[in-house]
Amino acid sequence: MAEKVLTRYTGKGAPTVTANRVIRASAAITTDGEYTDEIPVAGFERLTLTIDYAKNSETTWRLYMLHSPDEGVTWHWMLNVGAADSGGASAVVKAYDKFTPSDFAASDHVSIDIDVKAKQRVKFFVQAVGSGPFGLVGIGAQAGVSPVAI
């Protein structure tokens, strides 16, 4: 079965599609150091988020993710969740993942695979820690029905 792909990216101009099919684009984060996006993921099994980091940047970033089963339904935290209870709810261990300049020392980007089975919508936002200028950061997303090598 061919992989279904959904892409959503920030920035100006066309995104760069790498050989491993992760979508990346360069984008200037807004003056308040935040970016938010919402992605419909119904029918997909996993979501890969990729963050490109500005070279020589000293900014630390926090990535928050939430999911919602349907329109108008409460958003729930999604990163680093504990085991689901009988009602399907999960305990949040940590509400965000933090990326520091040292995380990007050996690579241009960091990718995160997230299980999105049975979820309808995913919302994520990236927040800079501290004051600007924040430089450039790229945020890419790909959803599919089977894992890909990254």
Residue ranges and their predicted role:
Residues T59-L79, V137-I139:
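Short, surface-exposed beta-strand/strand-loop-strand elements in extracellular ectodomains
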Residues A2-R21, I29, D52-N56, H67, ...:
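C-terminal interaction-tip segments
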Residues E3-Y9, P15-R21, A25-A27, L63, ...:
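Hydrophobic transmembrane signal anchors and adjacent membrane-proximal interface regions, especially
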Residues E34-A42, W77-S146:
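Beta-sandwich interaction modules
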Residues E45-L49:
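Structural beta-strand segments of beta-rich domains
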Residues P15-P40, A54-T60, D70-V73, G87-A89, ...:
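Surface-exposed ligand/attachment interfaces on beta-rich extracellular proteins
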